[in-house]
Regions:
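DG-centered beta-turn motif at the end of beta-strands
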Residues: 33-36, 127, 139-153, 160, ...
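Short beta-strand-loop
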Residues: 67-106, 183-196
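Bacterial N-terminal signal peptides
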Residues: 5-14
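C-terminal "exit" segments of structured domains
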Residues: 208-298
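Second-shell loop/turn segments in exported
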Residues: 32-42, 74, 90-91, 106-117, ...
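VWA/integrin I-like adhesion module and closely mimicked acidic/polar interface patches used
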Residues: 150-198
Length: 298
């Protein structure tokens, strides 16, 4: 028996430090927020405030600390062009009211910037690398993308989605139906919720929560976060989020559904069939630039 104990101790010391130090969390959640040119400074502020308010919500705090491990890890970045992702808050352990409040305060105090194009695919690929170095052992890895337009820069969004799903990263979406005038003159995308549903989201129990306007964003963020933290998305495939009792964060966290089989192929959990095609953003962009300037963007 003593020999086995010594052998076990030697095996532990032989493990890489990263493998020993990884802390178990109920959820590793990457929040990806659109700051492309279609978002004006006021809209960017409303998005930021939506997340700050949500993380200060007592119900969400209880949901975060009420799961099996009582903690989650969160990273927050903003994105625009395929090459432009800005990490505002790196992976942070949220395991108490104090740590959650500090996260919200740091987010509130971060500067707000606006960039140019819309590369959902760039955001997804950036998130894949972000998860690879998270330093946490998570029951679930979830990327949440919010935005007010379809992909028009970088690789096809469906190809980037496949890369993420192959790494067992589920993708949820928070499309913002924006009826405000676009500063570049691009037309509004009334079917953006369907684009996100069919072309962006994927993975077991992935879902879309629609913000009907930027003013509606705080409500949508709160509902989305509660469902993600409590693992209460639909069981099979992506769909619109079901109406849930969201008043008791602790009860939601404790009522989470059983996890899917570890061998589950995440790439099976997508919904094809978006009639305009998942390259619609790229085509709209080319048509717009050709019509307005007689050329296509670089």
């Amino acid at each position: 028996m003593r020999y086995l104990a010594c052998l076990f101790a030697l095996l532990l010391t032989a493990l890489p430090a990263a493998a020993q130090d990884k802390k178990e969390v109920d959820l590793a959640l990457a929040l990806a927020i659109d700051i492309s040119g279609s978002i004006d400074p006021e809209e960017a502020r409303l998005q930021r405030e939506g997340y700050v308010i949500a993380f200060r919500d007592p119900v969400i705090v209880k949901a975060i600390t009420g799961g099996p491990n009582g903690r989650i890890a969160v990273a927050y970045f903003e994105w625009s062009d395929s090459w432009n992702q800005k990490l505002l808050i790196d992976w942070t352990l949220l395991d108490s009211e104090t740590s959650i409040a500090a996260f919200a305060d740091k987010l509130s105090n971060s500067p707000i910037t606006i960039a140019r194009r819309t590369s959902i695919s760039g955001a997804i690929r950036y998130a894949v690398s972000l998860f690879a170095r998270s330093g946490y052992e998570a029951d679930r890895k979830v990327l949440d993308i919010s935005g007010d337009g379809s992909n028009n820069d970088g690789m096809l969004v469906t190809d980037a989605r496949t890369e993420a799903l192959q790494q067992r990263i589920a993708i949820n979406g928070l499309p913002i139906i924006n009826d405000r005038p676009n500063p570049f003159g691009f037309p509004a995308e009334a079917d953006l919720d369907q684009y996100y549903l069919h072309c962006v989201t994927g993975g077991p129990r992935s879902f879309v929560e629609v913000a009907k306007s930027f003013d509606d964003f705080p409500r949508a963020v709160r509902k989305k976060l509660l469902q993600e933290v409590a693992d209460r998305g639909p069981r099979r495939g992506p769909t619109d989020a079901a109406a849930l009792p969201l008043a008791d964060g602790t009860r939601l966290a404790q009522a989470r559904r059983p996890h899917d089989n570890g061998d589950e192929d995440y790439t099976r959990f997508v919904r094809p069939g978006y009639e305009p095609g998942c390259d619609v953003g790229e085509r709209r962009s080319r048509e717009f630039w050709q019509r307005r300037f007689g050329t296509t963007p670089d």
